[in-house]
Amino acid sequence: MPLSYQHFRKLLLLDDEAGPLEEELPRLADEGLNRRVAEDLNLGNLNVSIPWTHKVGNFTGLYSSTVPVFNSEWQTPSFPDIHLQEDIINRCQQFVGPLNVNEKRRLKLVMPARFFPNLTKYLPLDKGIKPYYPEHIVNHYFKTRHYLHTLWKAGILYKRETTRSASFCGSPYSWEQELQHGRLFFKTSKRHGDESFCSQSSGILARPSVGPCFRSQFKQSRLGLQPQQGPLARGLAGRSGSIRARVHPTTRQSFGVEPSGSGHIDNSASNSSSCLHQSAVRKAAYSHLSTSKRQSSSGHAVEFHNISSSSARSQSKGPILSCWWLQFRNSKPCSDYCLSHIVNLLEDWGPCTENGEHNIRIPRTPARVTGGVFLVDKNPHNTAESRLVVDFSQFSRGSTRVSWPKFAVPNLQSLTNLLSSNLSWLSLDVSAAFYHIPLHPAAMPHLLVGSSGLPRYVARLSSNSRNINNKHGTMQDLHDSCSRHLYVSLLLLYKTFGRKLHLYSHPIILGFRKIPMGVGLSPFLLAQFTSAICSVVRRAFPHCLAFSYMDDVVLGAKSVQHLESFFTSVTNFLLSLGIHLNPHKTKRWGYSLNFMGYVIGSWGTLPQEHIVLKIKKCFRKLPVNRPIDWKVCQRIVGLLGFAAPFTQCGYPALLPLYACIQAKQAFTFSPTYKAFLCKQYLNLYPVARQRSGLCQVFADATPTGWGLAMGHQRMRGTFVAPLPIHTAELLAACFARSRSGAKLIGTDNSVVLSRKYTSFPWLLGCAANWILRGTSFVYVPSALNPADDPSRGRLGLYRPLLRLPFRPTTGRTSLYAVSPSVPSHLPVRVHFASPLHVAWRPP
């Protein structure tokens, strides 16, 4: 006869009419009983022959992926001009006095952030924009390209101009070495003479493949080759130019550059238009005139003709340089859907590329990408705006994967101890938080995104994708890409983007200037950054509380008026550091704070309402006696696990589900087990904050017996059969709690101390979780434990009773100053003088 739910509850001692605990509880540790119950509840039967269920409510498992929806009306979000102040440490010190080591170290980590993976795999430009929406290829291409352009304009991306230089918009940082007209320009240095400056820049931009003698003159650095100063280096740089110039003296003409008399381009500043320009020209000459093998590897992806204005003017001089888009102007329409109809709509399509406000030197960056991008809805509640997803998962895979740094996430109890109080709360919204943190330019070659330009993208993805030859010159090839679909799409997009269609149809390679979201390093850096800032704020306002997790920042104060003035001061401080807040999204919570999916008030912590509703919906849809795919079980456990600490039996109740996921087998819910879980999650109990106090109740056990010391009282007992030591210690702790009712118990067992009961026999874990709910444990060494003697059967010997103080833990999140108490009545002026210099103790 299967086990009924009532009987199962009684078995777990969840009902009041259970017998004496000392007899009932040890029975639950019996392996035989655990096995029989598991069989009765059909928990152990993992091998099933019926087909698995792959969908429960919204949860899907193997073989079914949610089809993303493309929205042709997506708006690209606007990004403020985010520029985090470089002297952020000095500004913080002016605000709060000297920073402690922790804060300094964290702020230095992000100014600038560095990222050097072991190995970077470069992908062809065609893979830059993922064909995520096959029905909307062209539309998705332009929307993504527009998003990337917006990020570049906002100073979040670099644009690769040549192998060794990039341009960007916005304010430069000191570690970005600026090139002015192709020369390296250091703000700090006095310029000694044009000649040496120019030779230096030509060294930077010259290709390192000239030969060993050339390379040896330059010292290799993280940012590429840097010449050693001196006449030899200077002469060599000049000669390297001349070696190149003689290779193809005839080709120079077609590139719109007048060579000097001898056919030798001199490298001094007086008679060259710009070193940057020459190197671009050189590169173009090389890339088009070397062997076909070189051609195929370059992916014809980057058009070099538009690096400077002079070469852009010479568009009509040769077929190599002409722009795909503008070529349609001179061609006969091939059909009613020929792109030439669109190109002839406008006289002036604008430039082929846009130049940034600043040019900087970068390490050698290939014309490739390292990750693909695509667009999705900004979030489930906001489908009007798009969000860019960047796939840099290559850095988390394979043998060369980067092991990302770990960082402290506050656990539920720490969070409750810290934030459960009678304060008034508000939360700040940092806009585009990740894009605040600058990346060193040396990381650029590893974080590249971009696109190969419209013609290649469309040709590669269209059904009749012909091999793209190198005969761009012939009109037939030009019209290969004309199609009704492309024509209609472009006509609609013309309304949105206008002449930008031309700009966006060109290839582009962009590197990240601020940390991207798709790299495991970013959450770590953001967490370090916001926690350091909050630590500074707490020190400046010791009678208030500021706390952050990633980009979620909350402020708390004793009264609403106090909170408002605190909010104003903090906002001004954050703005002075260059942190952008979103004023429309500031939320005032009153006395119960919504944070990290929890509601935290003076009574403790509970999960937020939307999570409770999700759980109820999940149970409504949960099928009984049908095997459920383990991948779906993973999703279910993820949801139930979040709310498990608020239930009677906690995580141990979910152990059968964990076991099936580990075995990668289907799980079948029996009616009793489902009813048990359902009841567990219908009544949620708040997790309360721990109070500090003195521990006066101690428990200890041996495999055969247990002992308690409560004040001056001693108790002991024996087990029917010897038990594993951890199980015995857990039982002793349960007896101590039920006998004394004390919320503080001293134990010498680390497993009991951890309050994780998932490694014990299943039934015992569930029962112990309910008995010990809300109990805090203090570690007492065995030698000092007053319950040690009774557990060994000796009641006569008294060890002195310890006075063990208990301090509630706030985990590693407690970077927080000791606050003086605040008077309950409000003074005339809220006094912000900090007693910190006296009271602050480093954590």
UniProtKB/Swiss-Prot annotation:
Spans annotated as Polymerase/reverse transcriptase domain (RT): 347-690
Site (Priming of reverse-transcription by covalently linking the first nucleotide of the (-)DNA): 63
Keyword Hydrolase: yes
Domain Reverse transcriptase: 357-600
One of the GO biological process terms: symbiont-mediated suppression of host innate immune response
Catalysed reactions, as listed in the record: DNA(n) + a 2'-deoxyribonucleoside 5'-triphosphate = DNA(n+1) + diphosphate; Endonucleolytic cleavage to 5'-phosphomonoester
Annotated region described as Spacer, given as residue ranges: 178-346
InterPro entries xrefs: DNA/RNA_pol_sf, DNApol_viral_C, DNApol_viral_N, HBV_DPOL, Rev_trsase/Diguanyl_cyclase, RT_dom, Viral_Replic_Matur_Polypro
Coiled coil: none
Region feature (Disordered): 248-272
HAMAP family (alphabetical): HBV_DPOL (MF_04073)
Extra information: Hepadnaviral virions contain probably just one P protein molecule per particle.
Family note: Belongs to the hepadnaviridae P protein family.
Name by which UniProt lists this protein: Protein P
Gene source species: Hepatitis B virus genotype C (isolate Vietnam/3270/2000) (HBV-C)
Taxonomy of the source species: Viruses, Riboviria, Pararnavirae, Artverviricota, Revtraviricetes
